[in-house]
């Protein structure tokens, strides 16, 4: 089961809004492609590489300048996936606080 954090939902909305300023159709395509890649994690939760933050994974989205930060086995359930963030590859991640 895949769940989205409130931050990941916000990320998707911001990605959509940014692209939609120039092309609503492209925004739908990009967000749709991101969601398709995320859905694959339901069957292949270890598909991403080890993340830069402990206990996370990062999934690159082929052909798009975005990556998905997620956790597998949330709440002790091996089949659960939590999407933490969806970020542009140009972002400084993780941010230093």
Name every feature range the model reports, one short phrase each.
Residues 61, 67, 71-97:
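Enriched for short, Lys/Arg-rich terminal
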Residues 1-55, 76:
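Basic, Lys/Arg-enriched alpha-helical interface segments
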Residues 35, 63-64:
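Σ70-family region 2.3-2.4 aromatic/basic alpha-helix that recognizes the −10 promoter
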